[in-house]
């Protein structure tokens, strides 16, 4: 619970501008891990040079961060939020679980740079994302998806 609270203390700047922060997160993910861009069919054809500032990427990044905000605010009681997310990402989008680990590390970096997430907050965010990803992976296994 303390880890969720530590992360939520720095969540304000994210909530204040989901679109910009989401764009920063996905842009960095695609630049640091170009293979992840292929997992998003609508972004697959966007050249690396055109990723930053792309409105569609920023909009999807906002969607990702809004859902993460819901998960954070649930403080671990997130089964009802996570189950449909796991279902769509396993059965429709086919997103391997490792990609959630990659975006988690990108999020740690962006929140450190843009939201003042200190070393303790970074550890807390890694812990929280570890919990969420473990639960997501358990849902994947229930669905028979070995992503």
Swiss-Prot record:
One of its GO terms (molecular function) is peroxidase activity. Monomeric heme protein which primary function is to store oxygen and facilitate its diffusion within muscle tissues. Reversibly binds oxygen through a pentacoordinated heme iron and enables its timely and efficient release as needed during periods of heightened demand. Depending on the oxidative conditions of tissues and cells, and in addition to its ability to bind oxygen, it also has a nitrite reductase activity whereby it regulates the production of bioactive nitric oxide. It is an enzyme of class 1 (oxidoreductase). GO terms for cellular component: extracellular exosome; sarcoplasm. It comes from Thunnus albacares (Yellowfin tuna). This is Myoglobin. Keywords: Acetylation, Cytoplasm, Heme, Iron, Metal-binding, Muscle protein, Oxidoreductase, Oxygen transport, Transport. Nitrite binds at residue 60. O2 binds at residue 60. Its main location: cytoplasm. It is found in: Cytoplasm, Sarcoplasm. Residues 2-141 form the Globin domain. Monomeric. GO terms for biological process: removal of superoxide radicals. Belongs to the globin family. Disulfide bonds: none annotated. Heme b binds at residue 89. Its EC number is 1.7.-.-, 1.11.1.-. It catalyses: Fe(III)-heme b-[protein] + nitric oxide + H2O = Fe(II)-heme b-[protein] + nitrite + 2 H(+); H2O2 + AH2 = A + 2 H2O. It comes from the Eukaryota. Pfam families: Globin. The modification N-acetylalanine is found at residue 2. InterPro entries: Globin (IPR000971), Globin-like_sf (IPR009050), Myoglobin (IPR002335).
């Amino acid at each position: 619970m303390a880890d969720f609270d530590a992360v939520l203390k720095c969540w304000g700047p994210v909530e204040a501008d989901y679109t910009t922060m989401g764009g920063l997160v996905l842009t960095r993910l695609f630049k640091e891990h170009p293979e992840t861009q292929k997992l998003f069919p609508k972004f697959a054809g966007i050249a690396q040079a055109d990723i930053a500032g792309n409105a569609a990427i920023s909009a999807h990044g906002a969607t990702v961060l809004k859902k993460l905000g819901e998960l954070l605010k649930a403080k671990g009681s997130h089964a009802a939020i996570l189950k449909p997310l796991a279902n769509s990402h396993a059965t429709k989008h086919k997103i391997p679980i490792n990609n959630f680990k990659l975006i988690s590390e990108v999020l740690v970096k962006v929140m450190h740079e843009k939201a003042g997430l200190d070393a303790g907050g970074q550890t807390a965010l890694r812990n929280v994302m570890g919990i969420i990803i473990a639960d997501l992976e358990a849902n994947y296994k229930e669905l028979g998806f070995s992503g």
